[in-house]
């Protein structure tokens, strides 16, 4: 999806569109491994200017199995909206089911990671490994 909008500043009070989302800023908080947890996202949002924040990488299978680590990564609150979740995995059905689950609990966007070169992600067929076939 492409973000479009009018002003050139970081927010300026004008809404921009990201697919169906109307955002107050063209700045997005990208996923940063080990950092983009709920407290970090809230601090960044409090500073201001963020239109959409994204979680750290979440393993689709772990999310479907309701593993505590995966649930902690998607932890959110009303002040942390809109929120995108970055999913990784290698089984299409698990990716689909995880995306459907995330949509059902109100996540604004799903980001499928197909670029992470980290060994532990690629060795299970996720991240950049998805682009090899």
Name each region found by the language model.
Residues 120-133:
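Glycine-rich tight-turn/loop motif centered on a GG-T
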Residues 29:
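An anion-binding catalytic pocket shared by soluble metabolic enzymes
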